């Protein structure tokens, strides 16, 4: 799918429509296209691919079944906002609404800019930012997820802190037409270094497959520990040089060109099980 040189851009996020990251992107993207914002009305971080499907039912027995079309519907409330539409829903709700219900149809969806990096294959089904981009890709609309590393950056974030990430994103959108990028790629996952660091170039990366979560029981309660963030804080990571996490720690802008999952792998063991069942 070739991107238009003057694209209609759908902008969403998971930090909420009043977050500084989406404001910075809105300002920067207006220079390269027409921007429509459809974003959650509050912080919806780490909700992954979840939808509000069924959440607004008036009772457990109200399935909102449309008998004529044999499809389920679920209202997703919204209010008007100075940037666009503030949706009482998830980032994926916003992507679906923006792609299918808002005119004109978007040429590209941009999700972000997230306060905090989204690195590694494991985050794709967890991060609301990346999930919105994936949702758009499943809806056959090119998309970009944009996040900024904030580890160790202890100031209250303002739109100005995201200006560098926003300008980089606008440059990518502006440079895409004529390249055939979205004929071969469904979406990009872009991660930008901390705002107090000048980017040390760009790196085309693959999402790291390293995943180290731990769980313990202390004083009768469960605790989760993300060892990956501990490693990043210590700048001691096991990832190879071609990965997104390595690039960001080196101060580079990480760009991962991705296709939507999921691929079918070795089917022979499954076939063996079926033969045993039959």
Give residue spans per PLM region:
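Internal, conserved structured core segments that host functional sites
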Residues: 97, 103-152
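A cross-family phosphate/adenosyl-ligand binding-site feature
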Residues: 2-5, 24-101, 105
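Phosphate/ribose-phosphate-bearing ligand recognition and processing surfaces
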Residues: 138-166, 170, 177
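Short, glycine-rich nucleotide/cofactor-binding loops
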Residues: 12-18, 123-125
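Short beta-strand segments
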Residues: 12, 38-39, 111-114, 146-147, ...
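Short glycine-rich anion-binding loops that position phosphate/pyrophosphate groups of nucleotides
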Residues: 15, 43, 90-91, 114-117, ...
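Electrostatically charged, flexible surface regions
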Residues: 160-278
